[in-house]
Each structure stands twice: as structure tokens, then as C-alpha cells.
A protein has these predicted regions:
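Cell-envelope/extracellular polymer assembly enzymes that use nucleotide-activated donors
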Residues: 5-7
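Short beta-strand/loop segment that forms part of the nucleotide-sugar
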Residues: 10-11, 35-45, 67
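Short, well-formed alpha-helical segments that are part of the catalytic scaffolds
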Residues: 15-30
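A conserved acidic beta->alpha catalytic loop
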Residues: 15-16, 42-53, 69, 105-107
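Conserved donor nucleotide-binding strand/loop of the catalytic core
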Residues: 55-94
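Glycine-rich phosphate-binding loop signature in dinucleotide/nucleotide-binding domains
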Residues: 92-98, 128
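Short beta-strand-to-loop acidic/aromatic patch adjacent to the donor-nucleotide binding site
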Residues: 96-112
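Conserved catalytic core of nucleotide-sugar-dependent glycosyltransferases
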Residues: 107-176
Length: 176
């Protein structure tokens, strides 16, 4: 499995307990020889011990980025998620074949799958060069589609469109 570099990119804010569970699962994958190139964690304003835990993890395979005071520059949660996720994406090195796996660190992402099943899933992607990302599915429904901004993944920037409309018209919105 060494011909595919896997990057786990996740955002954290006050999610210490689930973050630990997700990191433990990824460490099991590393022990099984899965080609985990890097775990990238972008934290914004945690105050529950998440930052300290992430700092204790820092090594060649774990990149911890602190992006604090984001509420001063962005007006809503989706803009903050988008900004922080883009910071994480910028740290993926495109030198070899890469599989990007975003991890929502505030949920126990791997509680419903065993390491072997996940490894088998990753192996399926090795031979399919048209896939460069694996997105999590969870119940209850949890998916930050509006925060995804990698070119080619989302054709329309709904946040930007809503922002422009709000400048012209007096409208409200559910997400923006």
C-alpha cells in the first residue's frame, strides 16, 4: 500500500475526546502499514485541552496548525470552516498519488468501521486514479458541503453568492 500517500485533514475546536479516538484509529492504520503520509489538524480557538493534546502529538507525520481568532475575520461558521479547511488542504504535497480524507474530528468518525474494513476501502482507491478524496458519511447527517472549496469539487460558491445577494437585497438565509 505504499504507492498511495494518504492525508487525513481535520478541523478541531473543543473536541478532545473524539479527536483522541480518531487519532487512535489512524495510528492503528499506520501500524497496519497503510501509507498515511500526514495527519493535518487545523485548530481554531480550542480551550478544552485539544490544543495541548495536539501539540503533544506533533512529529513528522502530524502537522498541527493553530488558526485562532478567526471570528474576528469571518462572520459565520461556514466561512470559518472553509478558511480553516483550505489551510489544511494547502499542506497536502502533490508529489505522488494522493488520497485526501477529511476527518470531522468532533464526531467519532471511525466508530462504525473496523480497521480492516477501512484498509480494504483504501485499497480499492489505489487502482482508481479518478478518485482523490474520500468523504465521511455519518448518521445523524453531518456534511459540510458548503465548506469545501477545492477546485473541481464544488462548482458554485454558494456562500459568496449569498453574500453578494445580501449586499443588494434585504434577505435572510438559513445557512449563510
Amino acid at each position: 500500500m505504499n504507492n498511495l500517500n494518504i492525508y487525513f485533514v481535520g478541523l478541531s475546536k473543543n473536541c478532545l475526546l473524539t479527536l483522541k479516538k480518531n487519532i487512535d484509529f489512524i495510528n492503528l492504520l499506520i501500524k497496519e502499514g497503510v501509507g498515511v503520509e500526514k495527519i493535518i489538524i487545523v485548530d481554531s480557538d480550542s480551550n478544552d485541552g485539544t490544543k495541548e493534546y495536539c501539540k503533544s502529538l506533533k512529529n513528522d507525520n502530524i502537522l498541527f496548525i493553530e488558526e485562532d481568532n478567526v471570528k474576528n475575520n469571518f462572520h459565520n461558521r461556514i466561512e470559518i470552516l472553509s478558511h480553516c479547511r483550505n489551510i489544511g488542504l494547502q499542506n497536502i504535497e502533490k508529489t505522488n498519488d494522493v488520497l485526501y480524507i477529511p476527518i470531522d474530528l468532533d464526531i467519532d468518525l471511525f466508530s462504525l468501521i473496523k480497521p480492516k474494513s477501512f484498509i480494504d476501502l483504501v485499497k480499492n482507491f489505489q487502482n482508481n486514479k479518478d478518485i482523490d478524496a474520500l468523504f465521511p458519511y455519518s448518521e445523524p447527517y453531518y456534511y459540510d458541503i458548503f465548506a469545501l472549496r477545492k477546485q473541481g469539487w464544488v462548482d458554485n460558491n454558494a456562500v459568496l453568492q449569498a453574500h453578494k445577494l445580501k449586499q443588494k437585497f434585504k434577505i435572510g438565509s438559513f445557512f449563510f
